[in-house]
């Protein structure tokens, strides 16, 4: 592998601009070689003056790059030293507190089941667990800095060697010896000392002297490009996808020859449509993950996942393919229920029951850590007013907004099985003979409208919570206003539907209101998508017309196509309303929903690429490459006090003499920011534990 490719594959994406600009140096050298005057047509002195002038410019550029690298390395090293001191202090405080409360001196003697601990002991136990996670993440940051040191030195050595080869001189080697090999970023060995001290602290204080266990916790994943998936995972992905395609063809043929009446078809479609959308979402999320990795968008950091243990795109494809096979088999079983001894209504229950069990399975199998992380995240989303909202929280809530049809189909399935299903009919999903046919598919009692509003409500209260935490009306209250338009849209759609069924005279009034609020909502969300979520239409875009100053994906056409796609699908409701308002055939609304629901999932798939790109560029602007792990978050008063104590000679070590903390927990491990340094973005999100159990 050429060094340029090696460098590109191994850099820390958030620090990209702080590395040696190796490609730019190569271009300088090759350009100088191509533009050099020929000895055959000019005298030798002219050629020498040309190369002397070029070398002067070249080495000036090298000096600027070297100064940039020295400065960045020194800043990051100083930050690491401060953080290590804070971590050591917090560890000592936690250990001292445990010794005082429990009366023992070693971690091993203190270990007992968590449910036997008092409240104070639980807090201390949690602090130790958080400290293990914080040291693990800190160790990763040290390895990244060490990698930065090695890559830049190798880059200088390679480019100066190339300089000497092209110009047939030894001045490049002399410059390396006189400048690079004595540069602080190369001669400073404190990073190696910090790595050794961190390993020693974790081994002796947190893992009872078990170095093997400590190094397993501190293990850093390969820093290069994405590692190839295990062969069996790749095999299963191919196998599942192949079977899924064959089963889909079989489904189409079976649907043509087996389905007879609308009374049988539409309950099946409504019940199985949500499962298909979920499978589509998982598959497209796998493509998202692959695209992020290829483009260098650090989604692991953005979602604050465990960098040592998380799902790759191969795993997501595998899950989607496996669930897709089960979905096809379940639907085929319904088609052939007349020749089966199992009642037809069992198959949907078995399918969705398995999906739920797969998610909540308490055993440490089938991607236990990832499933548990998702469950915790779902809990945070549905209890949004009671937690600080991070990026992963509102990202998942945004996904739910595009998957609202799944919630509506789930509500329909529960209602259908509870009130409409004819249980004595084992061969088809026939509704019973109610006075109101298809009772569960109507807005009559408002339940469907409420269910349809749930995802927008979750984002609405998340925005209010973020406003409460930050006191910034923009963007949080403005964003809440965007989601509130969904409430009006759904309300007037429901009123129009019910009034149309009952042939009320004011039906058209609700149709016009529905159209007006759909237009307002679409314009609002479209502008927010392009300007706020994607960061496009930046006035400083320069040559990236209508985009932003810096873009990650290689082709500008991707951005322009995404803009057009977002405009079209944001206003796809115009087709839906036009057909719904003019058609008199039954089930037109079902047909429209079945067609447009997968398109909305696709729109969200495209949205994900550019939303995470924007967040990634924010991280690059802050040079944030690892997670911010806190033992206990600081309130405003605590943070002010901490900053004052850091200015004192004693630092933070004697802080307990100055004040009794509101919470009997350790202070934040994160280096406190001044108000002028803070960003509007708050990305502290739920993280996975780094326990020793395997993910699979």
UniProtKB/Swiss-Prot annotation:
Residues 672-696 are annotated as: Disordered. Residues 158-165 are annotated as: Important for inositol polyphosphate binding. Residues 2-224 form the SPX domain. It is found in: Cell membrane. The chain crosses the membrane at residues 229-259, 265-296, 310-337, 344-365, 389-422, 430-471, 473-503, 507-534, 554-585, 588-626. Phosphate binds at residues 398, 401, 482-483, 570, 603-604. Residues 260-264, 338-343, 423-429, 504-506, 586-587 are extracellular. It catalyses: phosphate(in) = phosphate(out). Residues 1-228, 297-309, 384-388, 472, 535-553, 627-696 are cytoplasmic. Residues 366-383 dip into the membrane without crossing it. The record marks 573 as: Gating residue for phosphate transport. The modification Phosphoserine is found at residue 668. Pfam families: EXS, SPX. It is a multi-pass membrane protein. GO terms for cellular component: Golgi apparatus; plasma membrane. The modification Phosphothreonine is found at residue 690. Signal peptide: none annotated. Keywords: Cell membrane, Membrane, Phosphoprotein, Transmembrane, Transmembrane helix. GO terms for molecular function: efflux transmembrane transporter activity; inositol hexakisphosphate binding; phosphate transmembrane transporter activity; virus receptor activity. It comes from the Eukaryota. The SPX domain plays a role in the regulation of phosphate flux. Inositol hexakisphosphate (Ins6P) is bound between two SPX domains of the homodimer. The SPX domain has high affinity for inositol polyphosphates and its affinity for inorganic phosphate is two to three orders of magnitude lower. Inorganic ion transporter that mediates phosphate ion export across plasma membrane. Plays a major role in phosphate homeostasis, preventing intracellular phosphate accumulation and possible calcium phosphate precipitation, ultimately preserving calcium signaling. Binds inositol hexakisphosphate (Ins6P) and similar inositol polyphosphates, such as 5-diphospho-inositol pentakisphosphate (5-InsP7), which are important intracellular signaling molecules involved in regulation of phosphate flux. Belongs to the SYG1 (TC 2.A.94) family. This is Solute carrier family 53 member 1. It comes from Cricetulus griseus. The lineage of its organism: Eukaryota, Metazoa, Chordata, Craniata, Vertebrata. The gene is XPR1.
């Amino acid at each position: 592998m050429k060094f340029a490719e090696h460098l590109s594959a191994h850099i820390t994406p958030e620090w990209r601009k702080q590395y040696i600009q190796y490609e730019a140096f190569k271009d300088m050298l090759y350009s100088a070689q191509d533009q050099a005057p020929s000895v055959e047509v000019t005298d030798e002195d002219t050629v020498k003056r040309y190369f002397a002038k070029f070398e002067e410019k070249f080495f000036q550029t090298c000096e600027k790059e070297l100064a940039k690298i020295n400065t960045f390395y020194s800043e990051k090293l100083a930050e690491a030293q401060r953080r290590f001191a804070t971590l050591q202090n917090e560890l000592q405080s936690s250990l001292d507190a445990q010794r005082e409360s429990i009366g023992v001196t070693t971690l091993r003697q203190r270990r007992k089941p968590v449910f036997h601990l008092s409240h104070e002991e639980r807090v201390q136990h949690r602090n130790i667990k958080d400290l293990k996670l914080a040291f693990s993440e800190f160790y990763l940051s040290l390895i990244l800095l060490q990698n930065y040191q090695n890559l830049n030195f190798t880059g200088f050595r390679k480019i100066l060697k190339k300089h000497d080869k092209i110009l047939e001189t030894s001045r490049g080697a002399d410059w390396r010896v006189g400048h690079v090999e004595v540069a602080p970023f190369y001669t400073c060995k404190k990073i190696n000392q910090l790595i050794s001290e961190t390993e020693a602290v974790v081994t002796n204080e947190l893992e009872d002297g078990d170095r093997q266990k400590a190094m397993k916790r501190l293990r850093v994943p390969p820093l290069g490009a994405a590692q190839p998936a295990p062969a069996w995972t790749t095999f299963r992905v191919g196998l599942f996808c192949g079977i899924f395609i064959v089963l889909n063809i079989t489904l189409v043929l079976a649907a043509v020859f087996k389905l007879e009446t609308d009374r049988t078809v539409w309950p099946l479609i409504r019940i199985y449509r949500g499962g298909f959308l979920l499978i589509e979402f998982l598959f497209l999320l796998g493509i998202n993950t692959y695209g992020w990795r290829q483009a260098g968008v650090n989604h692991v950091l953005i979602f604050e996942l465990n960098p040592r243990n998380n799902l790759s795109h191969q795993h997501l494809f595998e899950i989607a393919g496996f669930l897709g096979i089960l979905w096809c088999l379940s639907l085929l079983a319904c088609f052939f229920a007349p020749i089966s001894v199992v009642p037809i209504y069992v198959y949907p229950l078995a399918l969705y029951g398995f999906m739920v069990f797969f998610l909540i399975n308490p055993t440490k199998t089938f991607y236990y850590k990832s499933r548990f992380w998702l469950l915790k995240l779902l809990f945070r989303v549905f209890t949004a007013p009671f937690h600080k909202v991070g990026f992963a929280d509102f990202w998942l809530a945004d996904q739910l907004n595009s998957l609202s049809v799944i919630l509506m189909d789930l509500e329909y399935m529960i209602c259908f099985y509870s009130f409409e299903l004819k249980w004595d009919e084992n061969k088809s999903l026939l509704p019973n003979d109610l006075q109101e046919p298809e009772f569960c598919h109507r807005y009559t009692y408002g339940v469907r409208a409420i269910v349809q509003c749930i995802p927008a409500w979750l984002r609405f209260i998340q925005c209010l919570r973020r406003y409460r935490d930050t006191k910034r009306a923009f963007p949080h209250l403005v964003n809440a206003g965007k989601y509130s338009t969904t409430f009006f849209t759904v309300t007037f759609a429901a009123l129009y539907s019910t009034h149309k069924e009952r042939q009320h005279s004011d039906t058209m009034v609700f149709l016009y209101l529905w159209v007006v609020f759909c237009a307002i909502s679409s314009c609002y969300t479209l502008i927010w998508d392009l300007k706020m979520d994607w960061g496009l239409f930046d006035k400083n875009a320069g040559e990236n017309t209508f985009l932003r100053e810096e873009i990650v994906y290689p082709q500008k056409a991707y951005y322009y196509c995404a803009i057009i796609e977002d405009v079209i699908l944001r206003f796809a409701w115009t087709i839906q309303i036009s057909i719904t308002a003019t058609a008199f055939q039954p089930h037109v609304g079902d047909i429209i929903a079945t067609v447009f629901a997968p398109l909305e999932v696709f729109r969200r798939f495209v949205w994900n690429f550019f939303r995470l790109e924007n967040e990634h560029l924010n991280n690059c602007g802050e040079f944030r490459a690892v997670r911010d792990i806190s033992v206990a978050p600081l309130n405003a008063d605590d943070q002010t006090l901490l900053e004052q104590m850091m200015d004192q000679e004693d630092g933070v070590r004697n802080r307990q003499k100055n004040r009794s903390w509101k919470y009997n927990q350790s202070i934040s491990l994160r280096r406190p920011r001044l108000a002028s340094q803070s960003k509007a973005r708050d990305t502290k999100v739920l993280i996975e534990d780094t326990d020793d159990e395997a993910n699979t």
